[in-house]
Amino acid sequence: MTTRDATELFSEWALRNRDEGMESGHAKSVNEMLNIAIPMLVEPFSAIDVGCGNGWVCRKLQSNDNCSKVVGIDGSIEMITKAKQKGGGQFHLAKLPGWTPSQKFDFIHSMEFLYYLKDPLEMLKIFFNEWLNDKGVLIAGVDHYLENVESHEWPKSLNVHMTTLSEEQWRQGMVDAGFTDVETRRVGIKSGFVGTLAIYGRKD
């Protein structure tokens, strides 16, 4: 059976309003990630959310008085349609890595996006070289990673490609891309869930 594009899956979920469940399900991890990253930023800051879904993180960032601009990008037409309806930023429909923003940003946030790419570590290099301003910060959260054994069945059960990397591979990928002050941390831990792997670093 041919593996389907992840954006098709997310469009189906948006039509069934599962984006709202994704928002509530990821909120704890994202809040912890923002609490890590925002104090690292030079203010005021511009931000882009990669894999923005219905734009809920963009709206959260826009409510921050120190956020001067926020942009969201997603490959799902239904998710972007919802994001534009709800407002709270500029939203673009595009698939990565074949799209580059017209400006660089101080903050790149991504939740549950990178492992859907065939080469997510190459995307980290693109973020570093083409998307991020000097002194900028990237933080990315992934629930599908080697140490989260329960996530190993997701590619088969959803019939979607996922790149499975270990915590150390993600950390080294950030270093190889050029980031400094690279750290990984488990966030959103709760009973029955080992946590979202948050990977973050700075462009000096």
Go through each PLM region and give its residues.
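Short alpha-helix
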Residues: M162-G178
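Short, glycine-/aromatic-enriched active-site segment of Class I SAM-dependent methyltransferases
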Residues: D143-H161
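Conserved class I S-adenosyl-L-methionine
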Residues: M1-M40, L146-E147
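A conserved beta-strand element that flanks and buttresses the S-adenosyl-L-methionine
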Residues: H109
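Conserved beta-strand signature within the Rossmann-like core of class I S-adenosyl-L-methionine
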Residues: K135-D143
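Core SAM-dependent methyltransferase catalytic element
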Residues: R186-D204
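Class I SAM-dependent methyltransferase SAM/SAH-binding core
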Residues: I48-G98
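A short, conserved alpha-helix within the catalytic core of class I
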Residues: L117-F127
